[in-house]
Amino acid sequence: MSQLETRTEPMVVNFGPHHPSMHGVLRLVVTLDGEDVIDCEPVIGYLHRGMEKIAENRTNVMFVPYVSRMDYAAGMFYEAIVVNAPERLANISIPKRASYIRVLMLELNRIANHLLWLGPFLADVGAQTPFFYIFREREMIYDLWEAATGQRLINNNFFRIGGVACDLPWGWLEKCKDFCDWFGPKIDEYEKLITNNPIFRRRIEGLGSISKEKAINWSLSGPMLRASGVPWDLRKVDHYECYDDFDWNIAIAEEGDCYARYRVRIEEMRQSLRILRQACEMIPGGPTENLEASRIAEGKNSPFAGFDFQYVAKKVAPTFKIPNGELYTRLESGKGEIGVFIQGNNDVTPWRFKIRAADLNNLQILPHILKGAKVADIMAILGSIDVIMGSVDR
């Protein structure tokens, strides 16, 4: 009777594109030696919709509603970068109040982004409970967005060249402060449940380690870069919008592993709360109801009718032409640096519109940090990167 020989050659396994932990339609062709990963080839492009070419055939006002479909967890960030590029190319100034409103929306989006990362990441490593908690807090952010823009998750269509589409509704700032007061203790609750949980720490500490040099060489950004000990945050580096008005710190860790990336994102939510609280207190003109009352009481020559108290500099006409020239502009999203290279041709549509997605660059290092890992660790490492395939493929 012949004995079956042990199989010794490597095995090739497909993870995805239809896999519950693939965060969209990502396919990983993984080569295994037993339970050890010896190679990994990500296959992307399943969600490519030609967003850049669409942008080159639309006016800016027409294109803004499209962009939140690239990354449904970072719609406000993409709206911001899409209007920032022609603003800078045309040297358009925006009112201080409009800048504060933008910061409020961006920081709410940063918290929503990290919450939507936290729940599925913990579900991937076996902790189901926080997945239900994070949606409780996200609902409050959706309610704030719905009150201000009319939409909840995507298609907010709120950012405009020169400012925003409309001023904040009455009572919105108070509701935002209520959210900050509610959410602060909830982060403490997450930390008690997760941060020092021995099972969670043993599951992800030391996984997917990236050194400071490797993080820089691979052009990583956002929490992926800061978790490796690089204090690089575009809100501090580029001084865009009005972030210099606020007192906040860059969230940073040194270890470069999955646990460090978790800690950076938790701390970023705390820092976003600090910015939100300060913005609610310092916004020029204060709450909309007070601002409108002051304008009415003081008449036509009221200082509150000045430029910095408006929500938009000047409403851009549908025939607004993007001037000749080219530039690259960027901002710090929840996932890292997103940017737009725009080339104008004195036409209503841009001649070239290149989008840099943060998660595409961050995803490129995945094969290198998976080598030597176990099969069970693939989803934990991929989850710690935080990718949304809509913006990877565009």
UniProtKB/Swiss-Prot annotation:
Its EC number is 7.1.1.-. GO terms for molecular function: NAD binding; oxidoreductase activity, acting on NAD(P)H, quinone or similar compound as acceptor; quinone binding. Its main location: membrane. Keywords: Membrane, NAD, NADP, Plastoquinone, Quinone, Thylakoid, Translocase, Transport. It is an enzyme of class 7 (translocase). Pfam families: Complex1_49kDa. InterPro entries: NADH_Q_OxRdtase_suD, NADH_UbQ_OxRdtase_49kDa_CS, NDH1_su_D/H, NiFe-Hase_large. It catalyses: a plastoquinone + NADH + (n+1) H(+)(in) = a plastoquinol + NAD(+) + n H(+)(out); a plastoquinone + NADPH + (n+1) H(+)(in) = a plastoquinol + NADP(+) + n H(+)(out). GO terms for cellular component: plasma membrane-derived thylakoid membrane. The keyword Membrane applies. PROSITE patterns: COMPLEX1_49K (PS00535). GO terms for biological process: photosynthesis, light reaction. Disulfide bonds: none annotated. It is found in: Cellular thylakoid membrane. It is a peripheral membrane protein. It comes from the Bacteria. NDH-1 shuttles electrons from an unknown electron donor, via FMN and iron-sulfur (Fe-S) centers, to quinones in the respiratory and/or the photosynthetic chain. The immediate electron acceptor for the enzyme in this species is believed to be plastoquinone. Couples the redox reaction to proton translocation, and thus conserves the redox energy in a proton gradient. Cyanobacterial NDH-1 also plays a role in inorganic carbon-concentration. Belongs to the complex I 49 kDa subunit family. NDH-1 can be composed of about 15 different subunits; different subcomplexes with different compositions have been identified which probably have different functions. NCBIfam families: PRK06075.1, PRK07415.1. This is NAD(P)H-quinone oxidoreductase subunit H. It comes from Prochlorococcus marinus (strain SARG / CCMP1375 / SS120).
